[in-house]
């Protein structure tokens, strides 16, 4: 993907991103803003992934290691899967522990665009006050993600 230098470090999500509706595991449509509000008070690691994405699946063991090292962090998984069935099957199959949401549409749709999504897996780290501290990390950046989390304590 293209690397957009202007977007390498945003400290907050755009209005557009926050207004976007995503689907919760119990099939409710909820705005991204409401999702983030639910988890305020703790740092968040958010991963955009999909069950069809080979790199996402390959990175899952690293994600699990990150979770083991940082148990006090909230983990949000936003999937780009095409159907609810494929999404839920993927969560089961790869035993992904965390809070799960389904994005309506793909990488180039409005939510993907609002997050400057050019690659998945994509990781975003948010501090306990809701400020973005790492806007664009990918599967080769786990060390950076871990260091960022450690610096938040």
Please provide the spans of the model-predicted regions.
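N-terminal targeting signals for export/organelle localization
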Residues: 1-21
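A short beta-strand-turn-helix
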Residues: 22-44, 61
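Conserved redox-active cysteine motifs that mediate thiol-disulfide chemistry
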Residues: 40, 48-65
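A generic structural signal for alpha->beta connector loops
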Residues: 42, 72, 97-98
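Hydrophobic beta-strand anchors of alpha/beta hydrolase catalytic cores
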Residues: 45-46, 75
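Thiol/disulfide oxidoreductase modules built on the thioredoxin-like
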Residues: 58, 96, 103-150
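Structural microenvironment flanking redox-active thiols in thiol-disulfide oxidoreductases
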Residues: 58-94, 107-112
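Nucleotide-sugar donor-binding/catalytic module of glycosyltransferases
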Residues: 79-82, 101, 123
